[in-house]
UniProtKB/Swiss-Prot annotation:
Transfers the gamma-phosphate of ATP to the 4'-position of a tetraacyldisaccharide 1-phosphate intermediate (termed DS-1-P) to form tetraacyldisaccharide 1,4'-bis-phosphate (lipid IVA). Belongs to the LpxK family. InterPro entries: LpxK, P-loop_NTPase. This is Tetraacyldisaccharide 4'-kinase. GO terms for biological process: lipid A biosynthetic process; lipopolysaccharide core region biosynthetic process. Transmembrane segments: none annotated. ATP binds at T58, V59, G60, G61, N62, G63, K64, T65. Keywords: ATP-binding, Kinase, Lipid A biosynthesis, Lipid biosynthesis, Lipid metabolism, Nucleotide-binding, Transferase. It catalyses: a lipid A disaccharide + ATP = a lipid IVA + ADP + H(+). It comes from Dichelobacter nodosus (strain VCS1703A). The keyword Lipid biosynthesis applies. One of its GO terms (cellular component) is plasma membrane. Its EC number is 2.7.1.130. Pathway: Glycolipid biosynthesis; lipid IV(A) biosynthesis; lipid IV(A) from (3R)-3-hydroxytetradecanoyl-[acyl-carrier-protein] and UDP-N-acetyl-alpha-D-glucosamine: step 6/6.
């Protein structure tokens, strides 16, 4: 079962019904907040360049970060100067921060650091999206388009294109809002969804009308921390241990099992949790399997442990029609 997702978020049962009154209060507060923005009682910000929001309507583990990375790389290949803004979950900062190769993951957060490492795009981190954008454009005025990592529920930011990321194996859960379900806001979402992107094919229809695209992993390659590729056969010659701190670790474990890999021990920590060498004493005789998101938190590990890190690629395929849709939205709204 999901470590960070209560089982009753998957389908309705007595636990979800007991919590439903709290969900109705949460739902009412969100709807009130929506209406205040819709009426202009609370002001919203429109950036001077197009903004593409990649977000979700359920809590955690929807594959946003690999999707953001794939979109940035695809847009860069077409010649666009792309910047990224992120709240930076797991980080600690009091003002907007630009991510660079030497950034401390404890300050900027694991996802922004990973996005920068995989794309080399400028990434500005702050919980107030307007200030994050202003900081980004002040240092990189040549930026032509901004991707917001998460932010569908950040109503203070106007957008030009909204992409909804959904995990095919979870969908929208039981359809209830927090805490009885996983929904972060009532359906339909406040944002006008321009496209839905799922990691794998959905088994049920979604109650949201928008073009749907399916992404898959490009490959199942494993790499050492220095980027050297390592074969599955070589992996299986060693004791293998999993260390991960992601929202839905069973998805990572299922990929490993599908490749015929059975770890001796799987140590699973809370999403965004920092990883330290002191946690690894059980794995001294083998190799440590982790995700790319986990690897960015090993920057201060000793050479002994760095040499044991093995990362499974999470690079996604991107439909060319999705890129065309994004650019169409961005250019249409800015004419």
């Amino acid at each position: 079962m999901l470590r960070d997702i209560p089982f009753f978020w998957r389908k309705r049962c007595w636990q979800s019904w007991v919590l439903l009154p709290l969900s109705l209060i949460f739902r009412a507060l969100v709807l009130l907040r929506r209406q205040l923005y819709r009426l202009g009682v609370i002001a919203s910000y429109r950036a001077p360049v197009p903004v593409i929001v990649v977000g979700n309507v359920t809590v955690g583990g929807n594959g946003k970060t690999p999707l953001v990375i794939a979109l940035v790389n695809a847009l860069q290949e077409k010649g666009w100067k792309v910047g990224v803004i992120s709240r930076g979950y797991g980080g600690n900062r009091r003002k907007p921060v630009l991510v660079n190769e030497k950034s401390d993951v404890r300050t900027v957060g694991d996802e922004p650091l990973l996005i920068h490492q995989k794309t080399r795009a400028p990434v500005s981190v702050y919980y107030r999206r307007q200030r994050a954008i202003e900081n980004l454009l002040m240092h990189f005025p040549e930026t032509e388009l901004i991707i917001s990592d998460d932010g569908l529920q950040h109503y203070a930011l106007q957008y030009d294109c909204a992409l909804l990321a959904i995990a095919a194996d979870f969908g929208l859960g039981n359809g209830f809002c927090l805490p009885a379900g996983a929904l972060r806001e009532p359906l339909p979402p406040f944002a006008t969804i321009d496209a839905i992107i799922t990691t794998g094919k959905m088994s049920t229809a979604l109650p949201i009308s928008a073009p749907q695209f399916v992404t898959t992993f490009k490959n199942d390659q494993f790499y050492r921390s220095n980027g050297e590729r390592i074969s599955i056969e070589t992996l299986k010659e060693n004791p293998l241990y999993v260390v991960t701190a992601i929202a839905r670790p069973e998805r990572f474990l299922n990929r490993l099992h599908a490749l015929g890999i059975s770890p001796v021990i799987s140590k699973i920590f809370a999403d965004h949790a920092m990883l330290h060498e002191s946690m690894l004493t059980f794995a001294a005789d083998g190799l440590i399997l982790m995700t790319t998101k986990d690897q960015v938190k090993t920057q201060n590990w000793s050479a002994f442990w760095q040499e044991k890190i093995i990362v499974l690629s999470d690079e996604l395929t991107i439909d060319e029609e999705l890129i065309s849709l994004i650019l169409s939205c961005a250019t249409r709204t800015r004419k």
